[in-house]
Amino acid sequence: MNKNIKYSQNFLTSEKVLNQIIKQLNLKETDTVYEIGTGKGHLTTKLAKISKQVTSIELDSHLFNLSSEKLKSNTRVTLIHQDILQFQFPNKQRYKIVGNIPYHLSTQIIKKVVFESHASDIYLIVEEGFYKRTLDIHRTLGLLLHTQVSIQQLLKLPAECFHPKPRVNSVLIKLTRHTTDVPDKYWKLYTYFVSKWVNREYRQLFTKNQFHQAMKHAKVNNLSTVTYEQVLSIFNSYLLFNGRK
């Protein structure tokens, strides 16, 4: 099979592991699911046994044709041959997202599903190190994601679970959407603030006196142990100092 390395995938084929994953998804008969990466259709088939409707998006032509043949009689499954990064999720429909995503595109895809979809729950299989980076509020990605979703690990998936076997372990994570911590009208300011904050360009955000006031108000004694809630407090101080509130 000719592979586009950028979009290459490591497939889950073990029935035991697939069943463990399905159990963690806690799907209902009324659920509509969007799957990222049909692959060979192993997970797709199991999703369709429980959910009302599964729409599965696959870019690789060979895999799309293979899965189309395998799933052609399954009325609960709709296959779409498209790049997930170009796919438009519905605005007014309730749905969940499930995906075993390519490691190389983890950042792009997680941003896509969090910021360009309205999914209530998102389940992704990602590289273990990437999962840890999503929790790191000293990084841009962590500070952006936390405004919209909470993130938790559901299952650890050793490299032996996949074919071909990757060099790293993976995890199944759940992203649960919550009310945004940053209203839309402040989003551009927040992304600017975060870009400066993670690079410690504090002078681009505050005067010396403002910085000390913001730290005091957020009760920050040590910047190396700052919490997400404290960063939000500091951002609110930034808005106040700039007459935005």
From Swiss-Prot:
Keywords for the protein's UniProt record, in alphabetical order: Antibiotic resistance, Methyltransferase, RNA-binding, S-adenosyl-L-methionine, Transferase
Biological process terms in GO annotation: response to antibiotic
Top-tier EC class: transferase
Function: This protein produces a dimethylation of the adenine residue at position 2085 in 23S rRNA, resulting in reduced affinity between ribosomes and macrolide-lincosamide-streptogramin B antibiotics.
Full protein name: rRNA adenine N-6-methyltransferase
NCBIfam families named in the record: Erm23S_rRNA_broad, erm_B_23S_MT
PROSITE patterns the record matches: RRNA_A_DIMETH (PS01131), SAM_RNA_A_N6_MT (PS51689)
Enzyme Commission number: 2.1.1.184
Family: Belongs to the class I-like SAM-binding methyltransferase superfamily. rRNA adenine N(6)-methyltransferase family.
Entry binding sites for S-adenosyl-L-methionine: 10, 12, 37, 58, 83, 100
Gene Ontology MF: a single term: 23S rRNA (adenine(2085)-N(6))-dimethyltransferase activity
Catalytic activity of the protein: adenosine(2085) in 23S rRNA + 2 S-adenosyl-L-methionine = N(6)-dimethyladenosine(2085) in 23S rRNA + 2 S-adenosyl-L-homocysteine + 2 H(+)
GO CC list: cytosol
Biological classification of the source: Bacteria, Pseudomonadati, Pseudomonadota, Gammaproteobacteria, Enterobacterales
Annotated gene: ermBC
